[in-house]
Amino acid sequence: MALWGGRFTQPADQRFKQFNDSLRFDYRLAEQDIIGSVAWSKALVTVNVLTAAEQQQLESALTALLDEVRADPQQILASDAEDIHSWVEGKLIDKVGALGKKLHTGRSRNDQVATDLKLWCKEQVSELLNATRQFQQALVATAEAHQDAVMPGYTHLQRAQPVTFAHWCLAYVEMLARDESRLQDTLKRLDVSPLGCGALAGTAYDIDREQLAGWLGFASATRNSLDTVSDRDHVLELLSDASIGMVHLSRFAEDLIFFNTGEAGFVELSDKVTSGSSLMPQKKNPDALELIRGKVGRVQGALTAMSMTLKGLPLAYNKDMQEDKEGLFDALDTWADCLHMAALVLDGIQVKRPRCQEAAEQGYANSTELADYLVAKGVPFREAHHIVGETVVEAIKQGVALEALKLSDLQKFSHVIGDDVYPILSLQSCLDKRNAKGGVSLHQISQAITEAKQRLA
């Protein structure tokens, strides 16, 4: 059933119909379309288009249709309807006859689809917020179990300073907290109802759009009908949120892929999230993490595609805007799947503490401590930095750690160095001294875990 046709004297070419139809993907908006239609039927009563009895008959039929859709959403795809709006209207007419043809009075598919999509987006934001918080909780639990698991921290993929596995986990908690905040901000701008704006100039019926917005669970109604039917900022924002969130997940995946290598050997992933090789029987591949890392491209691509779709569109609605859904659906599905998978990766991960400790003790990661020691003795930092660089060269020549150099060797580079330097160079001292907020000391880690647990409770 097409919702238009009187203007045309020839049927649409079947090839055009296949090109034009959107039911194959916008069927996912069926529930929202039905819910919006129920609210619209109530609004039509207030302007005397429908009687209360007619509205009740329509609502009863729409509620029955909603139950059918929830039981078997795939049934929709068997139809040759143009889009989800025509499918719902056709089914409604099947149930109530000519009365179903009155429902679209004063409404356009332009404000209808905008409403459907916003309702769907609101539901998705709620689900993504839950998934984001669940992953944060998994990270916090992993951090709590590994507060004293010392490992090297890296810059330029070179060992830099000692940190703990807990500190690494908490770094991603912070990233995910920002993702959560972005979603909450997006929801504020998303939470306005388009319904009642018509095709572009508003509805000709004196409907209370604020009341209508409340029936649909929106905070308020939009202020300008022309902007409303043209607006897809919420799609761009959600795609941007997803893109940033996926970048964070990709970095998480890349770190663990490296930690899991034989060369690093810091962690071992559970069999539940790894796979083998068809040829090499010894292989245990981090496929879950590699797929998370690999799926960033499709999400970033959806954001770019939507930006390009919108950039040259005149007001108001254009058919180009039909391209808003497939990329959005896929991107948000992908982000949610990857959040759940990232949490699963942490379930059963083994941190190899002895190997982490060994790696942290290598690479002269305590060099900054020696520089700070010299500064405390009155040596200007830039000079201390140079002295420590020379000392590291000497240690490399001897093939020993800094703390293994004899005092006489250390004093070749600065006479202020004394026996009291050796406790300063211990790994534990390196950690304990980082006790300012956000640092890697056990006290700061414990406090950060407590604060994160309270926030996520």
From Swiss-Prot:
Provide the E.C. number(s) assigned to this enzyme: 4.3.2.1
GO terms for MF: argininosuccinate lyase activity
List the GO biological process terms: arginine biosynthetic process via ornithine; L-arginine biosynthetic process
The broad enzyme category this protein falls into is lyase
One CC-aspect GO term: cytosol
Main subcellular localization, coarse class? Answer: cytoplasm
Subcellular localization, as worded in the UniProt entry: Cytoplasm
Q: Which PROSITE patterns match?
A: FUMARATE_LYASES
What this protein catalyses is: 2-(N(omega)-L-arginino)succinate = fumarate + L-arginine
Give the record's pathway: Amino-acid biosynthesis; L-arginine biosynthesis; L-arginine from L-ornithine and carbamoyl phosphate: step 3/3
CDD domains for the chain: Argininosuccinate_lyase (cd01359)
Sorted keywords for this record are:
Amino-acid biosynthesis, Arginine biosynthesis, Cytoplasm, Lyase
Database matches in InterPro entries = Arg_succ_lyase_C, Argininosuccinate_lyase, Fumarase/histidase_N, Fumarate_lyase_CS, Fumarate_lyase_fam, Fumarate_lyase_N, L-Aspartase-like
Q: HAMAP family given for it?
A: Arg_succ_lyase (MF_00006)
Q: Which family does it belong to?
A: Belongs to the lyase 1 family. Argininosuccinate lyase subfamily.
User: What name does this protein carry?
Assistant: Argininosuccinate lyase
Q: Which gene encodes it?
A: argH
